[in-house]
Amino acid sequence: MARTVHCIKLNKEAEGLDFPPLPGELGKKIWQSVSKEAWAGWLKHQTMLINENRLNMADARARQYLLKQTEKYFFGEGADQAQGYVPPQS
């Protein structure tokens, strides 16, 4: 049976992650209160930030930036938006 959590991002009960996605306290906090659906949304947003800002993931500063953005995305005022990004029109 799938584990359910009250997702802090989607504000609803949803299937939880199978394991903490990051090491340390932030990973544990995400595992306890973020759904698979919300995590998938973060991965898309993270990819956009990496690509649009041309982040080099071998650079420790880029990794620290993404960790801060992860925390802001789920538990703060929201992550940064990529400069010049325009969402597709439906």
Swiss-Prot record:
GO terms for cellular component: cytosol. GO terms for molecular function: iron ion binding. Keywords: Iron. Disulfide bonds: none annotated. NCBIfam families: PRK05408.1. It comes from Cupriavidus taiwanensis (strain DSM 17343 / BCRC 17206 / CCUG 44338 / CIP 107171 / LMG 19424 / R1) (Ralstonia taiwanensis (strain LMG 19424)). Belongs to the Fe(2+)-trafficking protein family. It comes from the Bacteria. The keyword Flavoprotein does not apply. The keyword Flavoprotein does not apply. This is Probable Fe(2+)-trafficking protein. InterPro entries: Fe_traffick_prot_YggX, Fe_traffick_prot_YggX_sf. One of its GO terms (biological process) is cellular response to oxidative stress. Could be a mediator in iron transactions between iron acquisition and iron-requiring processes, such as synthesis and/or repair of Fe-S clusters in biosynthetic enzymes. It holds the Pfam family Iron_traffic. The lineage of its organism: Bacteria, Pseudomonadati, Pseudomonadota, Betaproteobacteria, Burkholderiales.
